[in-house]
């Protein structure tokens, strides 16, 4: 009697064998990512030096030190899914990499820090996308996007948030019946004259809520709608 050649007689892999296969994929990937990270640091050195200066000197952006390490930890949490996903380098990422390089060069030439910082933290996730490929990058899409929180942006909102805070203060004072006079960001009442300062704008709270709210939603909620709703509520 002839044995059916299509019959699968292979035995399931032992845990040690499976771990060995995973290491064959994981170890080269770690080395490649480390090399890519080193090249990124070398190319974006000037942008990194200036952004660290802002992180250190402005308490609004102190969180910047933790964003990239946190993003890599989130990627580490997805390692099992990554190992079961085809990893194939993708040139599609060049549609982001090339403009980012040009933006970085323009930022250096014109000493425009915002351009340098935006390009720096757009290049890193884009290079990882190029290394892993589109399919694998979808598995870690949030950690890659999370890296953009490293960009120290938000101070531009301070004047607008100061106006909102002043409007809110005036509205509350009117409800109490206290006589007042407002001139720009200054509010005068019988007890004295007060300024709605930058610290009253709430920009630190706004940025922190955005970062923490996004992270919490990613880790604890599954639906895209729920995640978006939670982040929006956290900003209020």
Protein language model annotation of sequence segments:
Residues 2-236:
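Hydrophobic N-terminal alpha-helices or hydrophobic patches in metabolic proteins across all domains
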């Amino acid at each position: 009697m002839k044995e059916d050649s299509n019959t699968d007689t292979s035995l399931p892999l032992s845990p040690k064998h499976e771990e060995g296969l995973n290491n064959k994929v994981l170890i080269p990937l770690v080395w490649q990512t480390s090399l890519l990270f080193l090249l990124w640091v070398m190319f974006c050195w000037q942008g990194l030096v200036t952004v660290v200066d802002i992180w250190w000197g402005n308490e609004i952006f102190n969180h910047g030190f933790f964003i990239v390490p946190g993003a890599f930890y989130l990627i580490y949490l997805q390692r099992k899914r990554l190992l079961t996903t085809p990893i194939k380098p993708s040139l599609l990422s060049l549609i982001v990499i090339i403009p980012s390089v040009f933006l970085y060069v323009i930022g250096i030439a014109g000493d425009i820090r915002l351009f340098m910082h935006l390009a720096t933290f757009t290049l890193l996730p884009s290079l990882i996308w190029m290394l892993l490929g589109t399919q694998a990058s979808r598995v870690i899409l949030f950690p890659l996007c999370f890296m953009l929180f490293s960009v120290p942006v938000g101070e531009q909102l301070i004047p607008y948030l100061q106006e909102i805070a002043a409007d809110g203060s005036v509205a509350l004072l009117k409800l109490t019946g206290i006589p007042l006079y407002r001139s720009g960001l200054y509010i005068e009442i019988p007890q004295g004259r007060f300024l709605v300062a930058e610290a009253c704008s709430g920009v630190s709270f706004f940025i922190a809520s955005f970062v923490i709210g996004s992270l919490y939603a990613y880790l604890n909620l599954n639906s895209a709608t729920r995640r978006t709703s939670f982040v929006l509520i956290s900003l209020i």
